[in-house]
Amino acid sequence: MKLTLKVSGKFFDEENSENLSLLRDVIIDLVNNGHRVAVVTGGGGTARRYISMGRKLNLNESHLDILGILVSRLNAQLLLFSLDNIAYPKVPESIEDFNERWASGKVVITGGFQPGQSTAGVAALVSEIINADYLVLATNVNGVYTKDPQKFVDAKLLPKLTVSELKTILEGSQSVNAGKYELLDPLAIKIVERSKIKVLVINFKDLNKLPNILKGNEILGSVVVPE
């Protein structure tokens, strides 16, 4: 299979840093089992701190986005170093860069590309260009819920849903401000929709179960299916 793994920037926050070795080991396991893997890293708390400081300096949204992009690329570089020779040795800075490096046959790890675009949008673009079998979103919730599970105790996990159903759930919760992107931003959803990309949403703490999920040996998270 060809997989795009979108890793929440929270994975790289200090309190979750012990999970980085898990992430590295899962990627190695996937490669050893014959999968081709692209990874997109978010910026996490470090990006939000820089964006917050930038706002206090009255920076515009494009400049704030660039700060977030630079942090996401630093996270990508950290993961890249940990994978040694199975990963392409440089972090791409555009979709064209990514495409050239994907041709190497190695794992390619990237952060953000340009202002106004979330790393979820980057992950959707990457999935489209490699014709991924799955876009895997490793985030801080257990899947897609009927509403925000961190705010509503009666939120219900949806094991399977369509892109249209996902759009309805996310409608009204999207923000285009730097550092405020939701699970999938509008651009990411459009790309997923037009290219009929299958999306798997799981908690990043369950990432070690991904190989079994892909084999059909375990059911976890939410699958967003094309229409």
UniProtKB/Swiss-Prot annotation:
The protein's name: Uridylate kinase
UniProt keyword annotations, A-Z: ATP-binding, Cytoplasm, Kinase, Nucleotide-binding, Pyrimidine biosynthesis, Transferase
Gene responsible for this protein: pyrH
NCBIfam families: pyrH_arch (TIGR02076)
UniProt organism field: Sulfolobus acidocaldarius (strain ATCC 33909 / DSM 639 / JCM 8929 / NBRC 15157 / NCIMB 11770)
Protein's cellular compartments: Cytoplasm
EC number(s) reported in the record: 2.7.4.22
Oligomer and partners: Homohexamer.
Enzyme class, first EC level, given as a word: transferase
GO CC, one annotated term: cytoplasm
Predominant subcellular localization, coarse grouping: cytoplasm
UniProt record similarity statement: Belongs to the UMP kinase family.
UniProt-listed Pfam families: AA_kinase
Catalytic activity: UMP + ATP = UDP + ADP
Annotated positions binding UMP: 43, 65, 113-119
GO terms, biological process: 'de novo' CTP biosynthetic process; UDP biosynthetic process
Cited PANTHER family: URIDYLATE KINASE (PTHR42833), URIDYLATE KINASE PUMPKIN, CHLOROPLASTIC (PTHR42833:SF4)
GO molecular function terms noted in the UniProt entry: ATP binding; UMP kinase activity
Pathway named in the protein's UniProt entry: Pyrimidine metabolism; CTP biosynthesis via de novo pathway; UDP from UMP (UMPK route): step 1/1
Activity regulation: Inhibited by UTP.
Function: Catalyzes the reversible phosphorylation of UMP to UDP.
Binding site for ATP: 6-10, 44, 48, 139-140, 145, 148
Domain of life: Archaea
